């Protein structure tokens, strides 16, 4: 659809952070101790350490973004205010698919790193013998008051921060998805306003037809139910459905063999269900909606299985869930196309916010244009004064020459012509 605005929302909050690295003061080098001063072609200049626990992640994001020529050009031309305000992040819509894919991968890796911290806390309580200090060494710089040792207080502080970040990450994704859907509808309606009555009816008819095509899909099993897991067992794992065994299933899908099903491993179980509804080759299927559906499925299963709310599923929790009635006889699962994602009042409120923002931008643009015109007038006035001054000086010099007086220099000193 021409009004579709594809956004990678979770990346929007990252680009403003580049300000820290961009504004950093370069390190002075004692050139007396540098033996080879010849320039090295294509030498790589490492950005300074920001001191943030996501420093490495930040550097990797910047490196990936700078591989995109369009974004690199925008970054070079952007001023500090554009970076701070987040306006530069809107350019993410225009980066290549390859760059977006790499950014997605970096984001997943960073979220996984935070999850490792939570697993370390659980392992510490169970005393499994894991080297926690080695695992958490990368996070020790967070505690500026105690940089030498890692105490229990440091671990608790990081656990709370990681948990809060992950929870906020999910909430933000839901909020941004809702805004995305409202923006799509807003753009669609605005586009219809530009059409004739006949063309508008054609577009409305196409829109309804695409909705019907999207809603026409096989039944989606309830996430985490026996039917859903057995389908994965049979179709993905290639095993006999009559031999389905929850314990074996758990071990098969504990990909990293750490004794837990983390959020990523859980989300992988829903791929077949999502493929029933979404196909990237179909214009009527929105892949951003698919990821929202995946998130909803994961949150739902976690709410039913993850008893201690540590965002990890143990084998014990998993087996206990398979003994519940809901595992065998679950309620039907409602996909996004069966739900009202926003009300008409919410859309109107969102559109009013957009209108306010557009008016503010328009006013700002008018102010900047006025400032530009004022500066141009001042420049023209100064140029005119400068021209008048030069003309007056030339006139005075000519008059002095006519009177036989030696011309003077800029400071009033006399200038004598050499005799020939």
From Swiss-Prot:
Residues 193-225, 365-420 are annotated as: Disordered. Ca(2+) 2 binds at residues 306, 308, 310, 317. Residues 1-24 form the signal peptide. Its main location: cytoplasm. It is found in: Cytoplasm; Perikaryon; Endoplasmic reticulum; Golgi apparatus. Found in liver, heart, thymus, muscle, intestine, kidney, lung, spleen and throughout the brain, in cerebral cortex, hippocampus, hypothalamus and medulla oblongata. Nucb2 and necdin levels were higher in postmitotic neurons. This is Nucleobindin-2. It comes from Mus musculus.
């Amino acid at each position: 659809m021409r009004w579709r605005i594809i956004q990678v929302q979770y990346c929007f909050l990252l680009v403003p952070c580049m300000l820290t690295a961009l504004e950093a003061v370069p390190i002075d080098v004692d050139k007396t101790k540098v033996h080879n001063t010849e320039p090295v072609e294509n030498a790589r200049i490492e950005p300074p350490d920001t001191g943030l626990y996501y420093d490495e992640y930040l550097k990797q994001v910047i490196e990936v973004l700078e591989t995109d020529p369009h974004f690199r050009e925008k970054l070079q031309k952007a001023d500090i205010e554009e970076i701070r305000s987040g306006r530069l992040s809107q350019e993410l819509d225009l980066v290549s698919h390859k760059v977006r894919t790499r950014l997605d991968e970096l984001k997943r890796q960073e979220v996984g790193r935070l999850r490792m911290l939570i697993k370390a806390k659980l392992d510490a309580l169970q005393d499994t013998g894991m080297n926690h200090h080695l695992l958490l060494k990368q996070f020790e710089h967070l505690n500026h008051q105690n940089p030498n040792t890692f105490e229990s207080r440091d671990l608790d502080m990081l656990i709370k921060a990681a948990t809060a970040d992950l929870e906020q990450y999910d909430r933000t994704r839901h909020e941004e998805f809702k805004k995305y859907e409202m923006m799509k509808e807003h753009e669609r309606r605005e586009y219809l306003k530009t059409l004739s009555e006949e063309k508008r009816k054609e577009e409305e008819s196409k829109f309804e037809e695409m909705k019907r095509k999207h809603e026409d899909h096989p039944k989606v099993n309830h996430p985490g139910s026996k039917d859903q897991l057995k389908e994965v067992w049979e179709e993905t794992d290639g095993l006999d459905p009559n031999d389905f065994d929850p314990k074996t299933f758990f071990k098969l899908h504990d990909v990293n063999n750490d004794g837990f099903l983390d959020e990523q491993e859980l989300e992988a179980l829903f791929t077949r269900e999502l493929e029933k509804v979404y196909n990237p080759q179909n214009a009527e299927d929105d892949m951003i909606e698919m990821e929202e559906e995946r998130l909803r499925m994961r949150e739902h299963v976690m709410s039913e299985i993850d008893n201690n709310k540590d965002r990890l599923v143990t084998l014990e929790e998993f087996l206990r869930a398979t003994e519940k009635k809901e595992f065998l006889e679950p309620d039907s699962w409602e996909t996004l196309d069966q739900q009202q994602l926003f009300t008409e009042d919410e859309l109107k409120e969102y559109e009013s916010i957009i209108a306010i923002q557009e008016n503010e931008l328009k006013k700002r643009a008018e102010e900047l244009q006025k400032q530009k015109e004022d500066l141009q007038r001042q420049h023209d006035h100064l140029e005119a004064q400068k021209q008048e001054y030069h003309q007056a000086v030339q006139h005075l010099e000519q008059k002095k020459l006519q009177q036989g007086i030696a011309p003077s220099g800029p400071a009033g000193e006399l200038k004598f012509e050499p005799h020939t």
